[in-house]
Amino acid sequence: MSKEKVLFVNQEIMPYIPESEMSKAGLDLPKGIQERGYEVRTFMPKYGCINERRNQLHEVIRLSGMNLIIDDTDHPLIIKVATLQPARMQVYFIYNEDYFQRNPGKGLETEELPELNDERCIFFVRGTIETVKKLRWEASIVHCQGWLSALTPLYVKKVYADDPSFRGSKVVYS
């Protein structure tokens, strides 16, 4: 019997973002689900305040390189990955310099530059979904955490409803 697959679309995950209720839940939920034998994929934005060297992020060339059109403008999608130890849980980071590198080290872009939050949200959700499709990974459950993932249920249930990666997926939002 194959493992159930759970996709986590997180706004924040500790230790990449300083400890808060949301970043702690972003770590504990996927980790706990993985420990129970589920196959887990976790995604979050690659904010400018995340130190790539300290957190050992590296670009996944085979997943990067596509462009997402938002408001009639092409935006390159860069995928980075890191592994949380000791759980050995991979975290995929959705990155684009226009949306997630504006204020490195000065706080989250969603707070520092809120005028771009609508486009930032669309880019993050579409980037996550397109990456999951490219992985050819079929999620049984999609768990969305935080307002930045709020469009995920709409995309999964309407736009990508017939796509094999999401056909039949259950969606949870917290």
Model feature map: region roles:
Residues 12-25, 51-53:
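A short, glycine/small-residue-rich beta-strand->loop->alpha-helix junction that serves as a flexible
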Residues 22-26, 30, 153:
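Short, highly selective alpha-helical patches that border small-molecule cofactor pockets
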Residues 28-38:
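A short, Lys/Arg-enriched amphipathic alpha-helix followed by its capping loop at the start of a domain
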Residues 42, 46-134:
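A conserved catalytic-core segment of Leloir-type glycosyltransferases
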Residues 117-174:
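Conserved nucleotide-sugar donor-interacting segment of glycosyltransferase catalytic cores
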Residues 18, 52-55, 151-157:
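A short acidic (Asp/Glu
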Residues 2-19, 44-46:
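Nucleotide-activated donor-dependent transferases that construct or modify glycoconjugates
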Residues 38-40, 91, 139, 171:
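Hydrophobic anchor at the start of a short beta-strand
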